[in-house]
UniProtKB/Swiss-Prot annotation:
This is Probable FAD-binding monooxygenase AlmA. The gene is almA. One of its GO terms (biological process) is alkane catabolic process. The chain crosses the membrane at residues 4-24. Keywords: Cell membrane, FAD, Flavoprotein, Membrane, Monooxygenase, NADP, Oxidoreductase, Transmembrane, Transmembrane helix. Its EC number is 1.14.13.-. Pfam families: FMO-like (PF00743), NAD_binding_8 (PF13450). Gene3D superfamilies: FAD/NAD(P)-binding domain. Its main location: membrane. Its cofactor is FAD. FAD binds at S15, E36, D56, F62, V104, V395.
Length: 497
């Protein structure tokens, strides 16, 4: 028998849990359920188990607006974040709303019934169909089954362990081992000091090109001080507002004065290295925030490099050998373990094939209305967090907008909403904008497209988005509402090419 729900949330990570709380508080009349393919909640924070896994943005802004992160630790570990999410689930009675081990295979919108028919498979390979008025994509934007794994020349000759961080072996013993980490992004710069601390013999970070890295304190001393003469709530609000402003300010400065921000970042790195490491390894060729700015707590990466427990090589791989990696410069890196921290493989909606009346959708041909609603697709929203600020900031304001939209529809007796796009608004860039990171560049045929102007342009500006989504009117000429039984004219879903 077909199970029916009002709102079906795909994914029980940060986005799905956040949306569920907002729905329970603001749309109590609506029944919702969460489908999660894994056996636990948390998304990223359940999947990644490598040493040192942590947030890369401050927890005062990474925490939900309805549950303060009331600690002075700036960056939290994966386990701490999952514990925080566990508390959110318990405090909001969400446990029975989450269906673990349920993979969504496909979702087809029936324009006559004004409902989504969603095919699901559980871990026992048993299939079932659910129907839903709304489908909410809260799956993040990468493939949980595999990361980006380029094939290196002669990789099969290597006799040691070859590991991708997305599939970290349980109880891996790297004590005294020579470790080479390929990559220079957030994962690599987290792994290096963590594996040094964990007893690795030596850790080498092998990169093709440098990344901008900023040092931040591990403890928020200002928050620590303000709590002594302010209430807990006031101190938290002050800290959150300050950090939101700092995030936005640094990004805006980098866009307007890239040379100045570059000079400041490089000076900060130089002070950390203290002449012990050549600055060429930390001097990128691109401008700050053309790729995501990485952060390290208390300069832990630079400390490991200064003390000789770790090293960095900027070079290209010629081939693997039985006991390491031969570089094009002629240098050979000996390794017992090689870790390929080479990035993510982008995937939208968790790989779910969407369709409208049986006609397949191609997400790369759609835009996002107000950064939330999928263009020309009825009753579907997608929550994708910020690339230049804490992910959760977008979750909160997007979820609040979705709740307002649903309540507007209920008040007026509508069953369907469609954000009709003007094709001339569609840019070639994806919703990630001008970001040049490798994993984003590889996703051009998967990611929704950027729009030229509001309400289709993704600004990645939390302060502007918060005001826009809070004040947004639903009778703007873009959103079209229908009741069951009405014919929907001229809908042309984008076919898979």
């Amino acid at each position: 028998m077909e199970k029916q729900v009002d709102v079906l949330i795909i994914g029980a990570g940060i986005s799905g849990i956040g949306l569920a709380v907002h729905l329970s508080k603001n749309c109590p009349q609506r029944k919702f359920e969460i489908l999660e393919r894994r056996e636990s909640f948390g998304g990223t924070w359940d999947l990644f188990r490598y040493p040192g896994i942590r947030s890369d943005s401050d927890m005062s802004t990474f925490g939900f607006n309805f549950k303060p992160w009331a600690k002075d630790k700036v960056l939290a570990s994966g386990a701490e974040i999952k514990g925080y999410l566990s508390d959110v689930i318990s405090e909001n009675q969400l446990k029975d709303k989450i269906h673990f081990g349920h993979r969504v295979l496909s979702a087809n919108y029936d324009s006559t019934k004004k409902k989504w028919l969603v095919e699901i498979e559980d871990n026992n390979k048993k299939k079932q169909t659910w129907s839903a008025n709304f489908v909410m994509g809260c799956t993040g934007y990468y493939n949980y089954d595999q990361g980006y794994a380029p094939k290196f020349p002669k990789q099969e000759d290597f006799k040691g362990q070859f590991i991708h961080p997305q599939h970290w072996p349980e109880n891996l013993d790297y004590t005294g081992k020579k470790v080479v980490i390929i990559g220079s992004g957030a994962t690599a710069i987290t792994l290096v000091p963590s594996m040094v601390k964990g007893g690795a013999g030596h850790v080498t970070m092998l990169q093709r090109s440098p990344t901008y890295i900023a040092t931040i304190p591990s403890i928020d001393f200002i928050y620590e001080k303000t709590r002594k003469f302010m209430s807990e709530e006031t101190a938290y609000k002050f800290t959150r507002a300050r950090n939101i402003g700092m995030q936005r300010g640094i990004y805006a400065l980098a866009q307007k004065y890239p040379k100045t921000v570059r000079r400041l970042l490089l000076k900060g790195i130089e002070l950390q290295l203290k002449g012990k490491v050549d600055m060429k390894h930390f001097t990128p060729s691109y401008n700050p925030w053309d790729q995501r700015l990485c952060v390290v707590p208390d300069g832990d990466l630079f400390k490991a490099l200064r003390e000789g427990q770790a090293s960095v090589e900027t070079d290209q791989i010629e081939k693997f050998t039985a006991n390491g990696i031969q570089l094009k410069s002629g240098k050979h890196l000996e390794a017992d373990i090689v870790i390929s921290a080479t990035g993510l493989e982008i995937q939208i909606l968790g790989g779910v094939q969407g369709s409208i009346d049986g006609k397949p959708m191609n997400t790369s041909q759609h835009m996002l209305y107000q950064g939330v609603m999928v263009s020309d697709v009825p009753n579907m929203a997608m929550i994708i967090g910020y690339i230049n600020a804490s992910w959760t900031l977008k979750v909160d304001i997007a979820a609040d907008y979705i709740c307002r939209l649903i309540n507007h529809m209920d008040k007026n007796g509508f069953d369907e909403v469609i954000a009709h796009a003007d094709p001339s608004q569609r840019e070639n860039d994806t919703i990630m904008g001008k970001m040049s990171s490798g994993y984003i560049a590889r996703a051009a045929d998967v990611m929704p497209k950027q729009g030229k102007q509001a309400p289709w342009k993704i600004t990645n500006n939390y302060l502007a988005d918060r005001k826009e989504l809070k004040d947004a009117k639903f009778n703007d000429g873009v959103l079209e509402f229908h009741k069951r039984g009405e014919q929907t004219a001229n809908r042309k879903p984008k076919l898979v090419s």
